[in-house]
């Protein structure tokens, strides 16, 4: 087992033991890829929401909030393209019986080759020191050139497969690259099939009168159908944005890696409406803005990178992910997408209602273009948890876990600890606690030796402990 895999298992175990995350319905053996946020987890999650909302809505005069419903008219999802195009290309390994997304298998293959390039560059940097010219090295080193050619060719073929909706050629690419099952090492693959990810349910008083609707697979459509209502009632001029935090649901067949990929999850999204022709400028602006926001959290600049999309969603003309270095490698944390006017135009067509903005500066009406920023809140939670998880060695050769969560995100900002329960210390400590708890979230603990109480607070990420002793 690798160090990262071992560490990830410890993080998952710690999350349960210290009240951050529980398996949903655990007494009934749980429900796969569905989790509950426990007493400390819900506080951390709420702090992440508050921080994002303050920075996105409170600090921006041209962004307002919305809380749209989970259930929407079913035609919404026909218009958005989800009914016909919200699919994952899935492939099974005949030997391990495990199922994978075909595009992810290929992307992981590309990442391994990129890792080889990075190692060559790192070795050269150490060898040549300050005289090293990375650009020249990339242009002249035979191994780097060969590996880069493999990456470029693979991306080109994969893109053509998706553009042509050619699953046969996509399967051939996996075979030609010699991609193996990450678990079994087998190359014995089935054909690739598309699988729609939406959950359906019914609405109505009886089976005869009910109609099929969907649990929303994303929160964005609730913003788009309310675009004109929000714009007119808030009297906002373009460019302006609408932000939302809410639950979404996807019938993920391949739901692994703890809370990274779940069937019920939460998104923090902002749709920014702009004048057609200016979307590229705003796309680059929001890319830069969002990366600055993430790095300001203090989780380590080296843990972030951009990954521009080669395969674009049906609504986008440009897309990039901010990836975070999770215990299982760099994976998507936030997506920034230039969605063009696809969504509003589609909803105009299917609803028969105009979704246009009248621009008084040019005296014209037009369908705005949209730049989207979308964070998976649960992934954000995991990024904070994983980067804050530290295992410290003690003098007696034992270890203890400390969560070094940024103070403004920690479940409790302060813990009040009476040194002992007698001599009036508990009463005095409780008075301090009662006076302060109205201002921010505080923990109070008087059980066990004070050293153990310090360790408990370290384990849940409390930044400050106030010990009430006889000199207080």
Where do the PLM segments sit?
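NTP/phosphate- and nucleic-acid-binding module
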Residues: 1-472
């Amino acid at each position: 087992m690798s160090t990262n895999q071992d560490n990830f298992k410890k993080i998952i175990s710690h999350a349960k033991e210290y009240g951050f995350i529980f398996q949903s319905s655990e007494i009934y053996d749980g429900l796969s890829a569905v989790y509950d946020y426990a007493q400390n987890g819900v506080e951390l999650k709420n702090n992440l929401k508050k921080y994002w909302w303050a920075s996105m809505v409170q600090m921006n005069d041209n962004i307002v909030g919305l809380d749209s419903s989970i259930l929407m008219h079913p035609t919404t999802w026909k218009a958005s393209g989800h009914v016909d195009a919200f699919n994952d290309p899935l492939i099974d390994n005949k030997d391990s019986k495990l199922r994978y997304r075909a595009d992810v298998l290929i992307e992981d293959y590309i990442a391994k080759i990129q890792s080889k390039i990075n190692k060559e560059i790192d070795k050269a940097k150490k060898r040549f020191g300050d005289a090293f010219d990375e650009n020249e090295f990339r242009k002249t080193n035979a191994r780097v050139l060969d590996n880069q050619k493999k990456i470029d060719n693979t991306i080109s073929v994969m893109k053509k497969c998706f553009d042509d909706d050619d699953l046969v050629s996509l399967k051939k690419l996996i075979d030609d690259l010699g991609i193996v099952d990450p678990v079994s090492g087998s190359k014995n693959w089935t054909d690739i099939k598309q699988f729609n990810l939406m959950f359906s349910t019914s609405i109505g008083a009886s089976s005869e009168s009910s109609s099929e609707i969907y649990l929303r697979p994303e929160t964005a459509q609730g913003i788009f159908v309310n675009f004109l209502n929000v714009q007119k009632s808030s009297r906002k001029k373009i460019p302006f944005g609408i932000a939302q935090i809410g639950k979404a649901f996807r019938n993920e067949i391949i739901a692994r890696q703890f809370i990274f990929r779940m069937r019920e999850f939460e998104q923090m999204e902002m749709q920014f409406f702009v004048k057609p022709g200016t979307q590229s400028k705003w796309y680059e602006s929001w890319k830069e803005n969002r990366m600055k926001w993430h790095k300001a959290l203090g989780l380590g600049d080296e843990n972030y990178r951009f990954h521009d999309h080669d395969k674009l969603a049906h609504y986008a003309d440009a897309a990039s992910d901010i990836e975070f270095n999770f215990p299982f490698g760099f994976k998507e944390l936030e997506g920034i997408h230039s969605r063009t006017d696809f969504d509003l135009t589609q909803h105009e067509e299917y609803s028969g209602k105009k979704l246009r903005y009248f621009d008084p500066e040019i005296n014209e009406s037009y369908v705005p273009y949209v730049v989207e920023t979308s964070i998976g809140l649960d992934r954000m939670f995991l990024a904070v948890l994983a980067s804050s998880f530290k295992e410290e060695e003690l003098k007696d050769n034992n270890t203890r876990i400390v969560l070094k969560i940024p103070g403004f995100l920690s479940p409790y900002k302060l813990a009040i600890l009476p040194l002992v329960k007698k001599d009036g210390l508990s009463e005095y400590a409780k008075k301090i606690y009662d006076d302060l708890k109205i201002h921010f979230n505080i923990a109070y603990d008087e059980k066990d030796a004070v050293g153990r109480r310090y360790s408990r607070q370290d384990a849940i990420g409390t930044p400050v402990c106030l010990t009430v002793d006889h000199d207080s």
